[in-house]
Amino acid sequence: MSIRFMLNETSYFGRGAREELAGELKKRNFKKVFLVSDKALVSAGVAAKVEEVLNKIGIPYDLYDEIKPNPTIKNVTDGVEACKASGADVIVTVGGGSSMDTAKAISIVMTNPDRADIKSLNGLSNTKNRAMPVIALPTTAGTASEVTINYVITDEDAEVKMVCVDPNDIPILAIVDSELMASMPKGLAAATGMDALTHAVEGYITAAHNEMSDMFHMKAIKLIFKNLAAAVNEKEPYAVEQIGLAQYIAGMGFSNVGLGIVHSMAHQLGAVYDTPHGIANAMLLPTVMRFNGENPETAQRFREILCEIGRPDAAHLNDQDVINTFVWMISELSKAVGITTTIKDYGAKEEDFEMLAEKAMNDPCKPGNPREVTKEQFVELYRKAM
């Protein structure tokens, strides 16, 4: 049986890597840039670091920054119109998952005008044409949208996060520059770091995992447990760089094998209560891992992880002790970076659980979970996460 892996054409990684953008734009003979970011990054001067690179080589660009933290259909449709008006031939996106996901959605519609109804992109999109070229420079260390075939857009009317999966949307270039991540506020660094951990853990235990994805996910897990607290609490440059690497290689893995029900549940919290995605994952991860660990094969995967992150004694523990230890280590890391909230703190109400569970049942991440889950079990998992 063959293994298919889809990645960027080219990737750059390291402090100051954004300078590579100039050479790539010249080499590919692009004439004008449509720059996609968000207002916070523009105000903080982060987007300006990339604008400096563009100005050095004299390439014209138009800036689009009308993007919400949970980007909406309107953010995309307005962006498409702005991109058309600009006459650009390449999109450069600077930001976290919000900016990158919006840029990817815009790029798909630009070359697939028959899919201008953004709702038609939900799930497996099956678009006909390769997206308009996108070069992605992440400013957060979590979503890995710069290397994935996924993007998430919120349908505000239906209160649903649309997980759009399309091999045509992967950016041609990913430039992971930890200097662009250094300005992240502590809370955002913690949230995106726990998002990256969720990607790596869910990717490692997902039903479709393989030897290649295992390699990426295990390395990401080790890097995150070792470096996240220092990256968040001390902004230690090497730790920030290592978390940037961890989130990227986790994305290399999960984009090709899928995720699980932590994401199925987190998407609904974001759509209904506007809960930040990384925080939602952090709050749900321990509860869901305890549930998934009841599958003996998954408990063994937890055992393998523990042996690699400083608990070699896990090789001799029974499954229940393995589950308890792994869940405890996740919870302790979350506390260490300042995430101590529950879904109740973000507005979750028990009377909403049936509705949330129904939506989670239809989420595209659900099929990847290593254990089957019913609507009733989703309700109970939300209840336990309170």
Annotate each PLM feature:
Residues 42-115, 229-240:
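N-terminal small/polar loop signature for handling phosphorylated ligands or for N-terminal nucleophile
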Residues 1-64, 385:
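An N-terminal, well-structured beta->alpha segment
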Residues 150-257:
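Carboxylate- and glycine-rich phosphate/diphosphate-binding segment that chelates Mg2+/Mn2+
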Residues 74-179:
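Glycine/threonine-rich beta-strand-loop-alpha-helix active-site module
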Residues 18-21, 43-46, 73-76, 98-103, ...:
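Short glycine/serine/threonine-rich phosphate/pyrophosphate-binding segments
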Residues 272-352:
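Gly/Pro-rich interdomain helix-loop hinge
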Residues 349-386:
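Short, amphipathic C-terminal "tail helix"
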